[in-house]
Amino acid sequence: MPAGAPSPARRRASVRADQRVERMLGALAATVLVLIAAMIATVFVKAWPSFSHNGLAWFGPGGDVDEQLRAMAEQSPVSGHSIYYFRAWSLIWGTLVTTVLAVIIALVVSLLAAIFLTEFAPAPMRRILEPVIRLLAAVPSVVYGLIGILAIAPYINEHLISNARKHSVGYVVQLNGADLATATVILAVMITPIMVALIAAALATVPRSWREGSVALGVNRWRTIVRVSLRTARPAIVAATVLATARALGEAIMLSMVSGGRGFGANPLDGVTFFFEPVRPLAATIVQNAEGLSIPALGHTMYAVAAVLLVSAAMLSFAGWAAKQPLKRYGIRA
């Protein structure tokens, strides 16, 4: 046996120790998967009564969703009869419009900010901005909600919504600054730091030789950024967009504070007024009705809302995976 080599007994002990660690880690991973599966199963089982009573009409329009939720909440928890009538379209529409608008705004701002950080910002400025961006990404959503109701909503109410506009729709809905515009702006501000951090990190990994080669061929700097840097970073851009969209879909506390809290289907045909109309996204609906979960019909309905959010997140993840697959044809790792 070579000098200093471990003895066979020591090697066997080391192998057994490694196997024990692997089994322990495998058991922990399996436990996590079982817990996640149990949580998902619980949500869908508790959501089933709401879906079974309403069918596919659950996802459609029909009546005032606030009145429907109020009718459920006013039932006695021990009542033998439950009212399950529910039409979630206005909540689904509120979720879609706030999420899509916020992600579009955040994507444009994030791309420009990431390009500035990696291509134009001096090193001292970059060393200051990068920690600030990470800090903004970690700010609790309730802080953004406070900024929305204390600063953004009053400003919109006083300076952007005229009295004539308020009176023109006053018989239908009250315009007070807690609306689609405020929710979209604050939500975009919330998800932008996440996207900037991910996209900037991807742009920073683009080989410098690729950019220098493009410039050497006579391509100007902006065209090099678009054709070389952004194209190479496409997987990260897709991943950042998916992650930010998932964050926007699941945001509850902030949106419950600034969106207006009404199940009102904001109508794009109303023109500019559309942006000043209140909305209520799905996640915010759960927060606003959390105290009534002990009431059977309301509790099952909120679980149904949670199930829709879970399915939406799963579909979003699959869409992100599918969007990145064509990039592999060009040798881009996704």
Predicted features and spans:
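Transmembrane alpha-helical segments of polytopic membrane transport and secretion proteins
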Residues: 1-29, 320-334
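Periplasmic/extracellular loop-to-transmembrane helix junction in inner-membrane transport proteins
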Residues: 8-24, 44-102, 122, 288-299
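Membrane-interfacial helix termini and adjacent extracytoplasmic/periplasmic loops
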Residues: 45, 53-89, 145-189, 259-260, ...
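Transmembrane alpha-helix signature in integral membrane proteins
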Residues: 85-116, 241, 309
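Transmembrane-helix boundary motif in ABC transporter permease subunits
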Residues: 101-133, 154, 160, 317-329
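Transmembrane alpha-helices
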Residues: 135, 139, 195-206, 219-259
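Non-cytoplasmic
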Residues: 146, 154-156, 237-275, 283
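Interhelical loop and adjacent transmembrane-helix boundary motif
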Residues: 256-310
